[in-house]
Amino acid sequence: MKIRASVRKICEKCRLIRRRKRIMVICFNPKHKQKQG
């Protein structure tokens, strides 16, 4: 899980979702997981 100021999709399978007022990226590839901090 990477904590970033700006989250973006890295590949085609990445999905932007909103959880507890935070933008997150979930993907089948664990390296692509991101959370906005």
Curated annotation (Swiss-Prot):
Gene Ontology cellular component list: chloroplast; ribonucleoprotein complex; ribosome
Keyword Ribonucleoprotein attached: yes
A GO term for molecular function: structural constituent of ribosome
Location of this chain's protein in the cell: Plastid, Chloroplast
Pfam families referenced in this protein's UniProt entry, alphabetically: Ribosomal_L36
InterPro entries tied to this protein: Ribosomal_bL36 (IPR000473), Ribosomal_bL36_sp (IPR035977)
Entry keyword set: Chloroplast, Plastid, Ribonucleoprotein, Ribosomal protein
BP GO terms, sorted: translation
Family designation: Belongs to the bacterial ribosomal protein bL36 family.
Protein name: Large ribosomal subunit protein bL36c
